[in-house]
Amino acid sequence: MGAAQPPSAPGDLARAGRALGRTARGGADASQLLGRHAVGCEGTHGVFPKCNLTCTPCYHSADANKVRVDGQHTVAQVDAQMAYFRQRRGPYAHAQLIGGEVSLLAPDDHAAALLRMRTHGREPMSMTHGDFDADYLRELVVDGRGGLRLQRVSFAAHFDSLMRGRRGAVRPRTEAELHPFRRRFVQMFRELRAETGLRYYLAHNMTVTPANLGQVAETVRAVVPMGYSMMSFQPAAHVGDDRRWREDYRQVGIDEVWAALEEGVGHRVPWEGLQFGDPRCNRTAWGALVDGRWVPVLDPHDARDLAARDRFLDHFGGVAFTGTAPALLLVKVLRVLRHHPGDAAVALRWATLAVRRAGGLRRVIGAARRGTVRPMTFEVHSFMDAAQVGPAWELMQRGVAAEDPELRATQERLAACTYTMAHPETGRLVPACAQHSVLDVEENAQLRKLLPLTVLG
């Protein structure tokens, strides 16, 4: 075995991201966003492991539901982890408030955690199974005087037929049985927006196994019109509580899920023009719905689109377009254009192509007037089995590159991970697959002692 720098060493995950901006799997890859326009996503850990639904599979360790939900613990840990992210990764990133079920937090504690994330320059997204009521959402975003304490929220709601215990759908047999619950979730936000002006972003998550792969296409057709701005699919992996493993999840990979997604959309969904991290892990297609038809941001086979992409990443890659005040963003864009005035013509040419893909200017204007234009992103995240992550991660901690091809591929994917968790107590940034496959087991065992379900005395 040869020597290899472990990516948990200070600065190494960031270096891996920057390297991916130049190369991908051994060759130049101009489509790579990591290290050029994004540092990657961030997530919390050990902040509220408990969940009140039962999923098959579940990425949590067996001890997760034996840990008490404690708001003070959550807010303190979120604050420490986000501060460390800011120190190591810079002033801005997207971060997930994730653990067990976020709505088990009291609304005040949930809001406090989101506000702490924003204090550290993070754009937070709450990860939920969606089985909470409008009253909870109202208490989360509205302050004691009736105003909004949270002007904008982002939620990723997980719905699939592998989940057990949802009110009204305790043991769903098909994905179609969950469509009313998917619609109800969006409707809660629409109604509160109409009343308070709340802004929101909603994503739809779905685990895919051999049991429901054949229902992905129909689910896409049903969910796309509902009002979500993203549909994300996660092929199941053998990770977490092994008592909940029911199938051979290796039968379902990123290609199979993407093909089912395209069947549901009704045409090809091109993803090759923009890549986020390792293509074995992530596949993402950004676009918009125009009168219900999905239109991609880029055509990866059109040289004019690719030229616009390259200009954008070369000149605007360091500009944060979300989370920046409009006036400040305008100043930043104008500053870039002052140094690269030719970018304006390239951008106009790209916009012309995008409008043409959407059916022409008249159609786009008409759809905008009808309110039927909105962003829509499709993605698949393919996680890895704990049986591979465990030994691969252990070798990486010793600075050793695996000789076994499967373990070496696992090491490559861990080193290129776009989804990171912070350990300020040890000075490490850890890939999510390593967190859930290796570190969660001991972490939740310790939390079970720190936050037992029953408090005596």
Predicted regions and their residues:
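C-terminal target-recognition/interaction regions appended to catalytic cores
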Residues: 363-457
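Canonical Radical SAM [4Fe-4S] cluster-binding loop centered on the CxxxCxxC motif
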Residues: 32-76, 89
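Conserved, mostly hydrophobic/aromatic
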Residues: 51, 97, 427
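N-terminal [4Fe-4S]-dependent radical SAM core
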Residues: 1-44, 88
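Short loop/turn segments at strand-loop or loop-helix junctions that form parts
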Residues: 47-48, 59-61, 155-163, 233-236, ...
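Radical SAM/AdoMet-radical enzyme domain recognition
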Residues: 82-83, 87, 91-97, 106-234
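Radical SAM enzyme [4Fe-4S]-AdoMet core and its adjacent flexible, acidic
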Residues: 162-181, 192, 196-390
